[in-house]
């Protein structure tokens, strides 16, 4: 459902001539998340015993479904803060009776043309963040629990490089057939054999402010794992 919503938003923004504002995208994302919550609640009774694919690589249980529902609810609460303009309040404050009775209140009115701050623009990036969280949480490996702190920071950082990093780690967990404790052993073995002379130039491209927000060790491990996995595929 999240992937279909992402594709539909990208298509509507690329094909149509009209350029919608970010508030409309936020409202569409809220409706899509409500459908996701309904879909997950209806599937709780069906997958009561859990569903596992590829030896536990994709493992879905009621616990993971409840966790996804909780993330969707929090995301709806975050998006609804910036999805609706105080239009009624604005016009009430501009009414002549209101101006004559409370003239000082006009200074506190919010104009409709006030731009939103950059971290609150658009709901498309929030869908990518939710997709990262669902990919990481659905994996039964132990290493899929450690990057969860990135998901909470992505709402504040809101930068493309960290979203791509989360998608890369999620794709790595799905592309490699490693589960449970085997994943920790393989990632640690990759770290010991990785040539950091190749990773350091890529590592320097990240902004210094953004690097301080992340754990440097995890960033190096993620890059090393992705590069090593690409070498294994070739």
From Swiss-Prot:
Compartments it resides in: Mitochondrion membrane
The record's principal subcellular location, in a coarse class, is mitochondrion
Q: Which GO terms describe its cellular component?
A: mitochondrial membrane
- What sections of the protein cross the membrane? 28-48, 67-87, 123-143, 154-174
Give disulfide pairs as residue numbers: none
Keyword check for Phosphoprotein, yes or no. Answer: no
The UniProt entry lists membrane topology as: Multi-pass membrane protein
Q: Which keywords appear in this protein's UniProt record, sorted alphabetically?
A: Membrane, Mitochondrion, Transmembrane, Transmembrane helix
Similarity field: Belongs to the complex I subunit 2 family.
Additional info? Could be the product of a pseudogene. Product of a duplication of 2 fragments of the ndh-2 gene in the mitochondrial DNA. These 2 fragments, which are not contiguous in the ndh-2 gene, are connected to each other by a palindromic sequence of 37 bp and together they constitute an open reading frame.
Q: What protein is this chain from? A: Putative uncharacterized mitochondrial protein NCU16001
């Amino acid at each position: 459902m999240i992937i279909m919503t992402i594709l539909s938003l990208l298509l509507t923004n690329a094909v149509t001539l009209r350029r919608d504002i970010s508030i409309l995208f936020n409202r569409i994302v809220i409706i899509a998340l409500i459908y996701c919550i309904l879909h997950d609640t209806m599937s709780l009774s069906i997958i009561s015993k859990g569903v596992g694919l590829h030896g536990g690589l994709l493992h879905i249980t009621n616990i993971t479904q409840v966790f996804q529902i909780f993330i969707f609810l929090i995301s709806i609460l975050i998006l609804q803060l910036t999805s609706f303009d105080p239009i009624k309040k604005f016009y009430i404050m501009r009414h002549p009776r209101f101006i004559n009775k409370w003239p000082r209140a006009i200074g506190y009115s919010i104009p409709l043309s006030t731009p939103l701050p950059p971290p609150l623009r658009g709901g498309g990036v929030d869908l990518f963040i939710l997709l990262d969280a669902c990919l990481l949480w659905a994996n039964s490996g132990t290493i899929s629990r450690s990057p969860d702190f990135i998901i909470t920071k992505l709402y504040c950082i809101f930068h493309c490089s960290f979203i791509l990093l989360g998608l890369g780690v999620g794709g790595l967990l799905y592309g490699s057939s490693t589960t449970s404790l085997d994943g920790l052993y393989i990632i640690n073995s990759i770290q010991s054999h990785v040539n950091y002379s190749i990773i350091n130039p890529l590592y320097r491209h990240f902004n210094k402010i953004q690097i301080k927000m992340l754990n440097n060790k995890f960033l190096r491990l993620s890059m090393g794992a992705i590069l090593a996995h690409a070498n294994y595929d070739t």
